[in-house]
Amino acid sequence: MIVKICGLKKAVDVAAAVDNGADMIGFVFAKSKRQVTVEKAHELAKNIPANVKKVGVFVNPTEEELKAAIKGVPLDIVQLHGQEPAKQANRTDAKVIKAFPVKDGKLPTNINDYPNAYILLDAPAEEYEGGSGKTFDWDKINRDMLTKNKLIIAGGLNAQNVQEAIKRFEPYAVDISSGVETNGEKDPEKIKCFIKTAKGVE
């Protein structure tokens, strides 16, 4: 199972994720309590091996902002969390994850407008997009509409429920931020436990 640890701001947190087998590291450039600058992400990225993908999280960025981060960090993947046009997701300079909030168990009607992107399902936004720590209603999702090898599950995951999410959705990857935090800060032990648990699913 591919595991993405998102919202990292400190070298010690990056090390905890990398050392315990994370496959993707997420840097949040959108307005958030986990926001970092391109310069900060560049410094943190120096300690990330090439086999671990670097992901930048954005909400309605300009094309200039995307290109600056892709080149400046550098990023392997951009994660779009807003109402970005489909053409912004069809790019050759980075792979794309398009995030969709799942409200009332309903998949967004425009989910098929992004055929080249990985599709991330998340809980509805609160103050900021993503990282709310809440799950969406797993029971109401029509899984027949989802392409498993392009699907990423997020929203309220933790070491206690990630195995159930994986068995239910059979996704390409799982994505976590607040679920590996204690008092708003990344917790190395929770990072270790989550990755071990997620990768332990047969």
Swiss-Prot record:
GO biological process: L-tryptophan biosynthetic process
Gene3D superfamilies: Aldolase class I
Keyword Amino-acid biosynthesis in record: yes
Keywords attached to this entry: Amino-acid biosynthesis, Aromatic amino acid biosynthesis, Isomerase, Tryptophan biosynthesis
Any one Pfam family match given in the protein's UniProt record, by short name: PRAI
Assigned EC number: 5.3.1.24
An MF annotation (GO) of this entry: phosphoribosylanthranilate isomerase activity
Chain segments annotated as transmembrane: none
Catalytic activity: N-(5-phospho-beta-D-ribosyl)anthranilate = 1-(2-carboxyphenylamino)-1-deoxy-D-ribulose 5-phosphate
Stored InterPro entries: Aldolase_TIM (IPR013785), PRAI_dom (IPR001240), RibuloseP-bd_barrel (IPR011060), TrpF_fam (IPR044643)
Cysteine disulfide partners in this protein: none
Family of the protein in this entry: Belongs to the TrpF family.
Name the UniProt record assigns to this protein: N-(5'-phosphoribosyl)anthranilate isomerase
Species of provenance: Listeria monocytogenes serotype 4b (strain F2365)
Name of the gene this protein is made from: trpF
